[in-house]
């Protein structure tokens, strides 16, 4: 085991282990963050990270903020920046980018506070709006070079331990877990989940018509409408097993599993929200979707139709404009450019049109401001953004939770990477919930939009009983 000293930041080079093997060893831990590049190997699916035992855990729930379980009256933004200021070390090149720091999720509903969007009363749900840990120990994986590291940030235990074991003790314990022999576990999920559709087909049609009327009246050009499925979690189905059983069926580059004790998040997202690498900003919104076909000729036709679709291209252009405006507020003037427009990308069950916008930050301290400026993502709100969010707040039947918020990390080295948690299930109070939706524009066809929304989560919800009747609100899957 090789150790490299860099200020208080240490890098331990370990024998390579598959991230899933290590995840299975730590799966009973709470406050666990597993940022899982599960897609086909590539630049978007090169690095994975696993972190447990945060020095600090910040939770926002029912409009109250808790630090390590104690309610605090704080300015969240200032607190997060103060935590990042604990240690700002120079990035070590040639190793994965999350070199200790903050990691967790921000919900869509918390983002409404940023833009002062009124939250219309929804069904009672005290799902935590934010869960973020400050991690001084992070396992990192370079899947391309087959390397595993333990990143360690040695801090003054008397000042930062917050009643945890001393840093060195925790590091030794994590390394001992790493060395444990791996026992192969079955990831077969034999549970038959009964998914309940929260919004009936009739309600869905009514709300899409309402959105189109807003568009025709000039309120908006596009908005993202979503609906939810829920299922009771069987007693013998663990949260991590639910994640693993669908991970290989989705194979997305920005997958993640987070377990904060009272809530778990299983994200199978294909969409990058914000990446910061050496102060260079990248955002890659998705707009434009069609289901794949096992018939190669048919699949090629579907791809060609998607690429040539004026409707989908128009949706994509609108959202590119929203994201370009959002990052321009923080990036250096003149640095924001559209790098790619409506490129076709293929995932396990759908084809998408993906655009890429880039910019440059002045300093590391702009990262939080960048996130605040961009949250929630333009691809899951609409255009103009604020009015679209107001309409979403009016029409959504339930709070979105982590869906359409953000999951990722901010490294002490100044890098950051967040997904937009679409194709994401939340497990809370023994209930599994998953949302699906899409952008609605003036010429949207209601039946087509409904089917497209279901297609997006078809690898998670395998609906054997197609909903041929409006009142049939149950989909049975196995």
PLM regions and their residue ranges:
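Extended alpha-helical targeting/anchoring segments
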Residues: 1-478
């Amino acid at each position: 085991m090789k150790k490299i000293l860099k200020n208080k930041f240490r890098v331990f080079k370990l024998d390579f282990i598959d991230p899933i093997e290590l995840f299975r060893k730590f799966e009973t831990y709470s406050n666990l963050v597993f940022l899982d590049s599960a897609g086909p190997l590539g630049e978007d699916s090169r690095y994975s990270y696993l972190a447990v035992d945060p020095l600090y855990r910040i939770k926002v729930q029912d409009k109250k903020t808790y630090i390590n379980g104690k309610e605090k009256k704080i300015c969240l933004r200032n607190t997060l920046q103060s935590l990042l200021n604990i240690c700002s070390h120079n990035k070590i090149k040639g190793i994965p980018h999350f070199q200790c720091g903050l990691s967790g999720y921000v919900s869509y509903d918390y983002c409404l506070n940023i833009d002062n969007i009124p939250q219309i009363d929804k069904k009672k749900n005290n799902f935590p709006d934010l869960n973020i840990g400050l991690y001084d120990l992070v396992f990192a994986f370079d899947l391309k070079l087959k390397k595993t590291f333990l990143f360690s940030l040695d801090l003054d235990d008397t000042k930062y331990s917050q009643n945890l074991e001393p840093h060195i003790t925790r590091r030794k314990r994590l390394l001992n877990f790493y060395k444990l022999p791996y026992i192969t576990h079955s990831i077969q999920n034999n549970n038959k989940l009964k998914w309940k559709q929260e919004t009936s087909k009739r309600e869905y049609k009514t709300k899409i018509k309402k959105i189109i009327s807003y568009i025709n009246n000039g309120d908006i050009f596009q908005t993202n409408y979503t609906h939810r499925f829920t299922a009771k979690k069987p007693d013998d189905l663990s949260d991590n097993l639910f994640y693993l059983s669908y991970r290989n069926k989705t194979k997305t580059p920005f997958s993640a599993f987070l377990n904060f004790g009272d809530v778990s998040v299983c994200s199978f997202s294909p969409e990058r929200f914000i990446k910061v690498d050496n102060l260079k900003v990248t955002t890659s919104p998705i707009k434009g979707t069609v289901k794949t076909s096992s018939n190669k000729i048919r699949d090629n036709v579907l791809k060609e139709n998607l690429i040539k679709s004026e409707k989908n291209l128009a949706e994509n252009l609108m959202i590119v404009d929203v994201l370009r405006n959002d990052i321009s507020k923080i990036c250096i003037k003149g640095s924001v450019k559209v790098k790619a427009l409506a490129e076709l990308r293929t995932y396990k069950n759908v084809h998408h049109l993906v655009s890429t916008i880039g910019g440059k930050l002045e300093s590391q301290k702009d990262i939080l401001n960048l996130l605040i400026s961009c949250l929630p993502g333009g691809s899951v709100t609409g255009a103009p953004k604020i009015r679209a969010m107001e309409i979403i707040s009016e029409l959504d039947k339930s709070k979105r939770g982590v869906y359409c918020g953000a999951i990722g990390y901010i490294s002490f080295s100044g890098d950051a990477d967040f997904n937009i948690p679409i194709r994401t299930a939340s497990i809370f109070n023994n209930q599994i919930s998953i949302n699906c939706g899409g952008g609605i524009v003036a010429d949207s066809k209601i039946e087509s939009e409904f089917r497209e929304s279901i297609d997006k989560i078809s690898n998670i919800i395998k609906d054997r009983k197609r909903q041929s009747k409006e009142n049939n609100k149950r989909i049975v899957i196995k």
